[in-house]
UniProtKB/Swiss-Prot annotation:
This protein's name: LPS-assembly protein LptD
SUBUNIT field: Component of the lipopolysaccharide transport and assembly complex. Interacts with LptE and LptA.
Signal peptide stretch: 1-22
GO cellular component: cell outer membrane; transporter complex
Lineage: Bacteria, Pseudomonadati, Pseudomonadota, Gammaproteobacteria, Lysobacterales
Family the entry assigns: Belongs to the LptD family.
PANTHER family per the UniProt record, alphabetical: LPS-ASSEMBLY PROTEIN, LPS-ASSEMBLY PROTEIN LPTD
Keywords, alphabetical: Cell outer membrane, Membrane, Signal
Gene Ontology BP terms: Gram-negative-bacterium-type cell outer membrane assembly; lipopolysaccharide transport
Location of the protein in the cell: Cell outer membrane
Record organism: Xanthomonas campestris pv. campestris (strain ATCC 33913 / DSM 3586 / NCPPB 528 / LMG 568 / P 25)
Listed HAMAP family: LPS_assembly_LptD
Function summary: Together with LptE, is involved in the assembly of lipopolysaccharide (LPS) at the surface of the outer membrane.
Length: 809
């Protein structure tokens, strides 16, 4: 018989709809039993997603131990099996009527396909009318974790009704949580189900009751409530957020974000997302009318999106706006364009990339988000900025050019008065007063920067040699306000032109060695870098976007010590450095690496950024003939669990440490981790402005289900903690509970805040409470073990669109 098998057209929708709502977080199923609740059936086809896609076009094969009845009313007895593609239906007995389409399957009814497995007592129905009834069901998901049961299921075409159904991702022998519903209506054509009087139980205790709700049963989205978030903090009080999802169209949707904070009031938020063939975007807005603490309206708008113009060009934008300078402190969130704790950046631009070139045209603007500062701390706006880079090999040579043209603008700065009584709580409003007294008037200007270069990279198996010659030309067009700002000389069109020559050379030696019975490949990699740049007077040049690089091992091999084009240091210097590694030959892992280097200055370096027109540019120590600080980096893998690292800078001129850091990490069993770090940094200009911190964090598994988490981040100079986190986690096969207490510095004044966070993770379903994951992943490096081996997130790296000519040879 080769009739289409239509007995089970429904992949039992409750088994698919609930996991479709699951939170997108890493889940640990390691505590679950390895044995399936419903083991695979003998004789069933292997899971085959390709066969599942074409099952409707395949014939049905029926077999059994005995066949009786007539040609129109066949009866199969004993080990009855129906197979079609990836589908399998087994029963002890099967009676069919080919004229009426009726069938009855009884005794040990079993069904399996690529994504679903089920057992039942009885199944009956009519193939012609596509009506079916299955009783006493137990099911299991095959392609994901989940199982449950139902007293009965009635199917009519693509519409079904489940009676007294359950769903859980727990092991059936220990259902820590389950969803129960007396009645669930399912419509496969529309892609949704409707549950009535559904209850979420943890153990035997009902914790959530839904008298009526709709949910998706496939990838199609549906309007409805999402799981809430809630928490408690000293600043906001009780904090409750109830997302409401709106499915507006296949390619765009929205989420309403009503939020109640007992100390502030109601905040209204929304998130709108769109997607099309050439791009996508997202906009988020929040509005808090009459904040009870600040006594004024608060709000924010954030947008990010891109559009692919063609294979070479892409338009991108990231726009951020907040209503006041305390917004970021009061409503900490993942804000687009967060340049630092004191400012946010908005950018719009179009960017192109080819085989040998990159180009872009963009504009940006900065907004102040620190109430203790005035506009002098903000970077200049680039309105607009155009750049072009090109590089290409020519035989043994390589040539390239960097070109940039920028128009810089800046808002005038107005005086900020601190509170006279020293109180900085600000609960009754902004205690720092922004006055109408202008304390600095900013002019604007344009800058053109060109840097063509040619190099000759030569290399062999044990050496490399790269001579490079470049020419840098920088020209300005300044308005009269800026040109007449001290220390500038009044020249509205200053220029700078100078050559840059460098020679980079290195050797590579290796040998096989053995330590404590383990074979290693030991390398020795000396490197020398000579740089010559003649002196050019640059005090008549403004400083727009230029800052000194933080001195580090990588800085030993750059042709400038500045990030922007407003300063190009003069140099007659030689860097000598060496690196040595011990690589384990069995697997290539690095056991130990040591690097050290120093710059020898043959002349004083006269160019500095001091006394510039831009207060935000800071200042630097002048460089005299002699030697730079020694820079050393070391990493040591004690064993496969324990590693250490250190960075050290010692200044022979002051005979003091400029920088020191020590970090160690120990990996525990069951994904536990312990981190310990010490950081010291000396301000070479202001000895009173130093950094000395200790940081201890851990995830300690007490047993397979309980673990403790914590962080103690302490300022040794201020003698007070910067952040304290303590908490416990309980984990099981299908449920995780996290409880955290956090105390942290919330603003530049050093004020502390307290918060309590709870999160319940119903694995495979969703989570509710506050997002403790985000807090713990930031505070404990390695909270998720994979984070140790991933590329740093984009918000910790340089904007890829901000090409820096100083990083080009």
């Amino acid at each position: 018989m080769r009739r289409a098998l239509r007995l089970l057209p429904l992949p039992l929708s409750i088994a698919i709809c609930l996991p479709a709502m699951a939170a997108d977080k890493p889940l640990n199923w390691g505590l679950c039993p390895a044995v399936d609740p419903l083991p695979g059936f003998d004789g069933a086809p292997a899971a085959d997603p390709k066969a599942a896609e074409i099952r409707q076009q395949l014939p049905t094969d029926i077999e059994g131990d005995q066949l009786s009845g007539t040609s129109t009313t066949p009866q199969y007895q004993g080990n009855v099996a129906l197979k079609r593609g990836d589908q399998f239906l087994g029963a002890d007995n099967l009676r069919m009527d080919t004229e009426t389409g009726n069938y009855i399957a009884e005794g040990n009814v079993r069904y399996q396909d690529t994504s679903f497995r089920m057992v039942a007592d009885r199944a009956e129905g009519n193939q012609d009318t596509d009506s079916h009834k299955v009783t006493n069901i137990q099911y299991q998901l095959v392609d994901r974790r989940g199982n449950g049961g139902a007293e009965s299921v009635d199917l009519q075409g693509q519409v079904g009704q489940m009676h007294r159904s359950t769903y859980t991702t727990c092991d059936p022998s220990q259902p820590i949580w389950r969803v129960r519903a007396p009645e669930i209506d399912v419509d496969n054509d529309e892609g949704f189900g409707t549950a009535r009087n559904a209850v979420l139980q943890i153990g035997k205790v009902p914790v959530l009751y839904f008298p009526w709700f709709k949910f998706p049963i496939d990838d199609r989205r549906m309007t409805g409530l999402l799981f809430p978030q809630f928490g408690l903090s000293g600043r906001n009080g009780f904090d409750y957020l109830q997302p409401i999802y709106l499915n507006l169209a296949p390619n765009y949707d929205a989420t309403l974000l009503p939020r109640y904070m007992s100390r502030r009031g109601f905040m209204f938020g929304t998130e709108f997302r769109y997607l099309y063939d050439g791009g996508r975007g997202e906009i988020t807005g929040n509005y808090l009318p009459n904040d009870n603490l600040r006594k004024k309206d608060r709000g924010s708008v954030f947008y990010s999106g891109y559009h692919n113009v063609n294979r070479y060009w892409q338009a991108r934008s990231s726009i951020s706006w907040v209503s006041d300078t305390r917004y970021v402190e009061d409503f900490t969130s993942r804000i687009n364009g967060m340049g630092s704790a004191s400012s946010i950046q908005s950018t719009v631009g179009i960017y192109g990339t080819g085989e040998t070139w990159t180009a872009g045209l963009m504009a940006d603007r900065w907004q102040l988000t620190d109430y203790t500062l005035d506009e002098r701390s903000l970077p200049y706006n680039r309105q607009p900025r155009a750049y072009f880079t090109w590089e290409k090999p020519f035989g043994i040579f390589e040539a390239g050019v960097y070109a940039e043209a920028v128009r810089f603008t800046h808002d005038d700065s107005y005086l900020v008065q601190p509170p006279r009584d020293g109180n900085t709580n600000g609960d009754d409003g902004d205690d720092y007063v922004r006055t109408n007294i202008r304390n600095q008037e900013y002019g604007s200007g344009s800058r053109l920067d060109l840097k063509p270069y040619i190099s000759m990279p030569l290399s062999g198996s044990a050496w490399f040699l790269t001579p490079t010659v470049a020419w840098r030309y920088t020209a300005y067009q300044l308005d009269s306000t800026l040109a007449n700002t001290a220390p500038l000389t009044g020249d509205r069109s200053p220029t700078r032109s100078l050559p840059i020559a460098s020679l980079d050379a290195g050797l590579y030696f290796d040998r096989e060695t053995s330590l404590f019975g383990t074979k290693y490949l030991n390398t020795l990699e000396p490197r020398a870098y000579y740089l010559y740049v003649p002196y050019r007077e640059q005090n008549d040049l403004p400083v727009f976007d230029t800052r000194p690089f933080t001195f580090s091992y990588g800085q030993l091999f750059r042709d400038t010590r500045y990030t922007g084009a407003d300063r190009q240091n003069d140099a007659n210097q030689l860097t000598l450095a060496v690196t040595s590694r011990w690589l384990r030959q069995d697997d290539g892992r690095e056991k130990l690496s040591l690097s050290a280097g120093q710059i020898l200055y043959f002349n004083d370096s006269l160019v500095t950024i001091n006394n510039s027109t831009n207060a935000a540019a800071g200042s630097e120590q002048t460089i005299e003939q002699g030697k730079s600080a020694w820079v050393a980096d070391a990493n040591y893998m004690i064993n496969d669990r324990w590693s250490m690292g250190a960075t050290y800078q010692w200044n022979p001129n002051s005979r003091k440490e400029d920088l020191a850091s020590l970090r160690t990490r120990y990996l525990l069993n069951n994904d536990g981790i312990i981190n310990l770090a010490y950081r010291y940094r000396r301000n070479l200009i202001d000895e009173s402005d130093q950094l000395k911190q200790a940081d201890f964090s851990f995830l300690y598994p007490i047993n397979p289900t309980w673990s403790a988490v914590g962080r103690y981040y302490y300022s040794l100079l201020d003698r007070k903690p910067l952040e304290i986190i303590g908490g416990v986690q309980w984990d099981s096969c299908c449920l995780a509970v996290r409880a955290l207490v956090r105390r942290f510095v919330r603003n530049r004044d050093g004020e502390m805040d307290n918060s309590i966070q709870f999160e319940f993770v119903l694995k495979g379903l969703s989570s509710f409470g506050q997002n403790t994951d985000r807090t713990l992943r930031r505070a404990i490096l390695g909270y998720y073990r994979d984070d140790l081996y991933l590329v740093p997130p984009s918000n910790t790296t340089t904007n890829p669109d901000d090409y820096d000519p100083n990083l080009i040879p």
